[in-house]
Amino acid sequence: MYRRIIMCFRSRATLNSFQRGMCCSTRRYVSSTGSEDDIKNFIIDNTEIVNSQSLTPEISLRLFTPTCRFWTENPEFWPFPDPYWAIYWPGGQALARYLLNNPEVSAGRKVLDLGCGCGASAIAARLSGASCVVANDIDPIAAIATKMNCELNNLAPLPCVTDNMIGSETDGWDLILLGDMFYDEALADGLHQWLQTCTNTHGTQVLIGDPGRAQFEDHNIRRSLHRLAHFQLPDSVKEENYGLTSSAVWRYNCKPDH
């Protein structure tokens, strides 16, 4: 199943809408019927606590590992939407590492982690002294996993919002974090437009983590970015991500960076 998730993530930009639906169409979505305690127990039973072989060994996360059942299990038996939250993606790793290395970036600020996945960037912001952190992911299972990961790191569970916040009002945020969000052209277009509003209208700072996927490198948004940091990925992360060797953090500028 792990390989399927990686390949689905890599290919989504080139799939048509029918094929995208087929990535998940056979799932038995039970997120709305199972209790939160049942879902937590399922996550505990089918993930492993990991705090090594990443760019942020000081953060513990519940993730898929080769010892987990669904690493190799037929994905048709997975009862939820595809578990992107169970993988620590390289863009998110770079973003979390940057925040931990530079705590002044988030200290005392109101932070939104958009598309939070496992919640690592949100956790890094909170550990770095952010006054308020909200995690956002449209997958309600990711929200539960993020709260569990907060507890692993001796933090009170962060507020998690499962609405699609792209296009929403953002005047309350000092800093918006986006890790590995530029995998689909239509999504990237929507993000670009929304981020322009965030920065131009409200002065929100935006940081983006991405390992250099083609969908990101080829998008017009690259002209509006300034690279802040660059990290070599651990060997295990390189292997799991099919040749991606490094990951970077970018600041979104109001005007194109020439």
UniProtKB/Swiss-Prot annotation:
EC numbers, comma separated: 2.1.1.-
Pfam families in alphabetical order: PrmA
Enzyme class: transferase
SUPFAM superfamilies xref list: S-adenosyl-L-methionine-dependent methyltransferases (SSF53335)
Keywords noted in UniProt: Cytoplasm, Methyltransferase, Mitochondrion, Transferase, Transit peptide
The UniProt record lists the keyword Transmembrane helix: no
Catalytic activity: L-lysyl-[protein] + 3 S-adenosyl-L-methionine = N(6),N(6),N(6)-trimethyl-L-lysyl-[protein] + 3 S-adenosyl-L-homocysteine + 3 H(+)
One GO cellular component term noted in the UniProt record for this chain: mitochondrial matrix
Main location class: cytoplasm
Cystines in this chain: none
UniProt GO molecular function: protein-lysine N-methyltransferase activity
Tree of life domain: Eukaryota
Cellular localisation: Cytoplasm; Mitochondrion matrix
UniProt family annotation: Belongs to the methyltransferase superfamily. ETFBKMT family.
Function: Protein-lysine methyltransferase that selectively trimethylates the flavoprotein ETFB in mitochondria. Thereby, may negatively regulate the function of ETFB in electron transfer from Acyl-CoA dehydrogenases to the main respiratory chain.
PANTHER family given in the database record: ELECTRON TRANSFER FLAVOPROTEIN BETA SUBUNIT LYSINE METHYLTRANSFERASE
Name used for this protein in its record: Electron transfer flavoprotein beta subunit lysine methyltransferase
UniProt organism field: Danio rerio
Upper lineage: Eukaryota, Metazoa, Chordata, Craniata, Vertebrata
Gene name in the database record: etfbkmt
